[in-house]
C-alpha cells in the first residue's frame, strides 16, 4: 500500500505509517459505498503531453515516454489463464483489473497501464473489465490520461470504468483508513453494485487483479493470477520494496504466525528491516521466501494482489441484505466482504484496510492467502527498474517453466494451514504494539447477534 512518496521516506521516519487518525464517527465501518461526489476535473496536461502518454501506453514499441523494458510473456506458462470460448461465456467478465491511482504518479503510467493493457490483450479483452479511480492526491495529470484512455480500452473490446471522487485520504480531521477503504470499494463498485447492463456479468469465478500505483510488468500480473489458480489460493500478493530491497508494506502485512514481516521496535526504527521473517515460528515461510517460493501469510497487500470474487458475492441470510448491498457487516459471516476501517467502539485494533480485509476473509473461511516473492514491485519508475535488477524479473526466477508446479528442491505447492494464528500483532502505533486475538471484535460480537 503506497502511502507516501520517496522523498518523504527515511528508515527511521516511518511512525506516520501507524499513526492514529481522527476517531471514527459512530460504529459503522461497513457503510462505505454511499453516494460519492466527483472531484472537479481541471485539465493539467497539454493535448500533446496526453497524446504522448497514450501512445506509450498502448504501443509497446513506443519511446515517446520513458519506461524500463519488461520481458516477453511466457505463453506456455500462462496460456491456461486464457478463457476458452467453449467453456466461458463472452458475456461474462472473467477478470476485473482494479486500479486505485489517486494522481500520485503520471510518470508511472507508461509502465503500469501498458502492462495492464498487455495482460488484457493476452487474457482476452472481451473477458476483461478495467475499473480505475483517479484523483485525491497531488494533481499531476493522471486523470487527464485516464480520460483519454477510454476509447482505446473500449476499442479493444474491454469494459472501462473511471471515477474521480472527491475523497482525500490525507484530509485532516478525517479517518484516513475509512477514506482509503471507500476508495477501494469504489474501484470494486462495478462488481459489487453493478449497473443494470452489467448485472450478471460478474460471477464468483471472476478474478480481481487489484493494483496500486506501482511499476509493474505484465508477467508480474500474470504470475499473481497463475499462482492464485494453480495453488487454489483465495488471494495472492506481490512483495513490494523501497531502497533497492527494503520490504515496504510492514504495517499491513502479517505472517502466518501473526507477526510483522520484520521486527519494528517501540521507537519505530527500521534497523531490523534487513532481517525478514526472523522468528522461529516463521521458519518455514523464511525457507520458502529464500527459495522464491510462495508462502502463506495471515495478511498482505504489497502493491498488487489477485483474489477471486466469491467472498464479495456472499449471500446474506439477513432480510434486506444481498451480495450487491451497500451495507456489509464484518460480524456476519453471511455478509459479503468489503474494505473497511476498524470497529472502534467494539475495541477492534486500528489496522490498515487491507489487513482488515484479510481478517474478514479468514473469518469467512477464505484463509488461503499467499505472498509471491518472485513478483517484486516498487513505487517509482526508477525504483521499479532497480528492484528488478536486485530481485530479478519473474522470468529470472521461474525461467521457461510451464504451468505445472515445480516440486524440487523445495515444493512450489503450498501446504495450506486452514486455521489462523491465535493472535495477531496490533500496532496502532509502534509505541503501543500488543498482541490481540486474530478475530478480535468479530468473535465477541458474533456471539451477541
PLM regions: where:
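Catalytic donor-sugar/metal-binding loop of nucleotide-sugar-dependent glycosyltransferases
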Residues: 294-296, 303-305, 309-314, 318-323, ...
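Active-site-proximal specificity loops/subdomain of glycosyltransferases
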Residues: 130-206, 211
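Conserved catalytic core of nucleotide-sugar-dependent glycosyltransferases
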Residues: 214-328, 401-421, 425-441
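Active-site donor/metal-binding and catalytic loop motifs
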Residues: 9-12, 364-388, 400-401
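Short, acidic, metal-binding catalytic loop of nucleotide-sugar glycosyltransferases
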Residues: 114-127, 152
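Phosphate/oxyanion-binding active-site loops and adjacent basic polyanion-contact surfaces
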Residues: 102-112, 138-142, 175-184, 349-353
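N-proximal low-complexity "stem/linker" segments adjacent to membrane-targeting elements
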Residues: 1-118
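A Trp-anchored, charged/polar loop motif used as the substrate-binding/catalytic surface
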Residues: 72-82, 184-193, 278-293
Amino acid at each position: 500500500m503506497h502511502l507516501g512518496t520517496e522523498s518523504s521516506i527515511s528508515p527511521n521516519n516511518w511512525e506516520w505509517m501507524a499513526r492514529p487518525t481522527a476517531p471514527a464517527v459512530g460504529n459503522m465501518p461497513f457503510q462505505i459505498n454511499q453516494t460519492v461526489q466527483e472531484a472537479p476535473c481541471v485539465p493539467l496536461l497539454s493535448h500533446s503531453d496526453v497524446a504522448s502518454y497514450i501512445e506509450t501506453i498502448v504501443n509497446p514499441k513506443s519511446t515517446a515516454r520513458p519506461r524500463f523494458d519488461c520481458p516477453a510473456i511466457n505463453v506456455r506458462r500462462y496460456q491456461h489463464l486464457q478463457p476458452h470460448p467453449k467453456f466461458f461465456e463472452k458475456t461474462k467478465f472473467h477478470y476485473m483489473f482494479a486500479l486505485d491511482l489517486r494522481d500520485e504518479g503520471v510518470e508511472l503510467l507508461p509502465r503500469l497501464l501498458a502492462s495492464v493493457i498487455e495482460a488484457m490483450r493476452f487474457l482476452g479483452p472481451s473477458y476483461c473489465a478495467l475499473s480505475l479511480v483517479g484523483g485525491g492526491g497531488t494533481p499531476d495529470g493522471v486523470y487527464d490520461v485516464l480520460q483519454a484512455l477510454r476509447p482505446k480500452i473500449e476499442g479493444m473490446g474491454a469494459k472501462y470504468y473511471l471515477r474521480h471522487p472527491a475523497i482525500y485520504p490525507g484530509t485532516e480531521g478525517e479517518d484516513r483508513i475509512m477514506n482509503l477503504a471507500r476508495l477501494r470499494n469504489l474501484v470494486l463498485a462495478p462488481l459489487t453494485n453493478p449497473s443494470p447492463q452489467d448485472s450478471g456479468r460478474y460471477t464468483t469465478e471472476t478474478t480481481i487483479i487489484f493494483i496500486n500505483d506501482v511499476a509493474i510488468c505484465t508477467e508480474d500480473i500474470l504470475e499473481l493470477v497463475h499462482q492464485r489458480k494453480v495453488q487454489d489460493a483465495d488471494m495472492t500478493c506481490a512483495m513490494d520494496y523501497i531502497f533497492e530491497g527494503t520490504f515496504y508494506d510492514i504495517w499491513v502485512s502479517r505472517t502466518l504466525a501473526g507477526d510483522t514481516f520484520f521486527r519494528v521496535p517501540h521507537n519505530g526504527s527500521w534497523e531490523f528491516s534487513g532481517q525478514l521473517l526472523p522468528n522461529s515460528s516463521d521458519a518455514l515461510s523464511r525457507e520458502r521466501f529464500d527459495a522464491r517460493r510462495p508462502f502463506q501469510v495471515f495478511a498482505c497487500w504489497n502493491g498488487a494482489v489477485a483474489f477471486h470474487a466469491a467472498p464479495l458475492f456472499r449471500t446474506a441470510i439477513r432480510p434486506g441484505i444481498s451480495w450487491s448491498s451497500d451495507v456489509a457487516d464484518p460480524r456476519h459471516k453471511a455478509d459479503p466482504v468489503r474494505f473497511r476501517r476498524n470497529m472502534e467502539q467494539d475495541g477492534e485494533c486500528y489496522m490498515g484496510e487491507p489487513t482488515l480485509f484479510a481478517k474478514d476473509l479468514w473469518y469467512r473461511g477464505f484463509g488461503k492467502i499467499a505472498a509471491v516473492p518472485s513478483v517484486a514491485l516498487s513505487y517509482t519508475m526508477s525504483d521499479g527498474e532497480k528492484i528488478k535488477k536486485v530481485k530479478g524479473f519473474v522470468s529470472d526466477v521461474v525461467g521457461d517453466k510451464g504451468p505445472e508446479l515445480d516440486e524440487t528442491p523445495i515444493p512450489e505447492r503450498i501446504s495450506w494451514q486452514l486455521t489462523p494464528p491465535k493472535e495477531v500483532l496490533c500496532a496502532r502505533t509502534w509505541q503501543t504494539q500488543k498482541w490481540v486475538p486474530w478475530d478480535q471484535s468479530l468473535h465477541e460480537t458474533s456471539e451477541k447477534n
